[in-house]
Curated annotation (Swiss-Prot):
S-methyl-5'-thioadenosine binds at residues 33, 108, 140-141, 165. The gene is speE. Pathway: Amine and polyamine biosynthesis; spermidine biosynthesis; spermidine from putrescine: step 1/1. NCBIfam families: MFS_SpdSyn (NF037959), PRK00811.1 (NF002010), speE (TIGR00417). It catalyses: S-adenosyl 3-(methylsulfanyl)propylamine + putrescine = S-methyl-5'-thioadenosine + spermidine + H(+). Spermidine binds at residues 64, 88, 158-161. Belongs to the spermidine/spermine synthase family. GO terms for cellular component: cytosol. Disulfide bonds: none annotated. The lineage of its organism: Bacteria, Pseudomonadati, Pseudomonadota, Gammaproteobacteria, Enterobacterales. It comes from Escherichia coli O81 (strain ED1a). GO terms for molecular function: spermidine synthase activity. Its EC number is 2.5.1.16. This is Polyamine aminopropyltransferase. Residues 9-238 form the PABS domain.
Length: 288
């Protein structure tokens, strides 16, 4: 039997992960990114950008449920949601499950990513691109949040790692723009890497976001594809109470929503804000 081709991730220099490639479905460089989608027996279809795994069919539900349901249920009455990035459609899929949301705007820098994922990762979007509440904007995320006349209750930054095109979504200019178009008591969330390996990302985000929001923190989830420990998600708002809602309040909102999830539940919601001591110490040691 011929040995299977292996795809190696290049996120870290000294160690990493690899996937056996059963079948390459798509591989092409777009104007902005090097995109590959392939099949793996353990994780299903895998998408990688610029040598870094972005999503897999097997475990994407953890990431997308936590990025959407935590801020939306904490907010309690979000009507207008902005997604920055998210071209694979799974973030959109989870937001559309909230029937009280009236509009969902998604800003993606690369139209090619959307078309590729719609064809090759259909389970990610699950038809959500056809939701009448959805609007796609092809634009740079920093430009959009600093120019739009729209305002939003929840902003979800489904950004890549802070390298290449994704770097701009970790800048003060982006955070300032998000504050600009976020409604009072609105919530901003963003992926912030695996904190054991990428601690500086969390520290940098905390420092920058604190210039614009009165309550800045993180919550976490364990996602197998993003190896190295827990993944952290940045959280920023001017309503300090939203990060500290009781499990009972979240439970009532969860039941009213009719959601049925595979990872998220109200107990996970409140527990997710408990951070390991090494991250708490790192954040506390930074100058205010």
């Amino acid at each position: 039997m011929a040995e299977k081709k292996q795809w190696h991730e290049t996120l870290h220099d000294q160690f990493g992960q690899y996937f056996a490639v059963d079948n390459v479905l798509y591989h092409e460089k777009t104007d902005h990114q090097d995109l590959i989608i392939f099949e793996n027996a353990a994780f299903g279809r895998v998408m990688a950008l610029d040598g870094v795994v972005q999503t897999t069919e097997r475990d994407e539900f953890i990431y997308h449920e936590m990025m959407t349901h935590v801020p939306l249920l904490a907010h309690g009455h979000a009507k207008h949601v902005l997604i920055i990035g998210g071209g694979d459609g799974a973030m959109l899929r989870e937001v559309t499950r909230h029937k009280n949301v009236e509009s969902i705007t998604m800003v993606e820098i690369d139209a090619g990513v959307v078309s590729f994922c719609r064809q090759y990762l259909p389970n990610h979007n699950a038809g959500s691109y056809d939701d009448p509440r959805f609007k796609l904007v092809i634009d740079d995320g920093v430009n959009f949040v600093n120019q739009t006349s729209q305002t939003f209750d929840v902003i979800i930054s489904d950004c890549t790692d802070p390298i290449g095109p994704g770097e701009s979504l970790f800048t003060s200019a982006f955070y300032e723009g998000c504050k600009r178009c976020l409604n009072p008591a609105g919530i901003f969330v963003a992926q912030n890497g695996v904190c054991f390996l990428q601690q500086e990302e969390a520290i940098d985000s905390h420092r920058k976001l604190s210039h614009y929001f009165s309550d800045v923190g993180f919550y976490q989830a364990a996602i197998p594809t993003y190896y190295g420990g827990i993944m952290t998600f940045a959280w920023a708002t001017d309503n300090d109470a939203l990060r500290h809602l009781s499990t009972e309040i979240i439970q009532a909102r969860f039941l009213a929503s009719g959601l049925k999830c595979r990872y998220y539940n109200p107990a996970v919601h409140t527990a997710a804000f408990a951070l390991p001591q090494y991250l708490q110490d790192a954040l506390a040691s930074q100058p205010s």
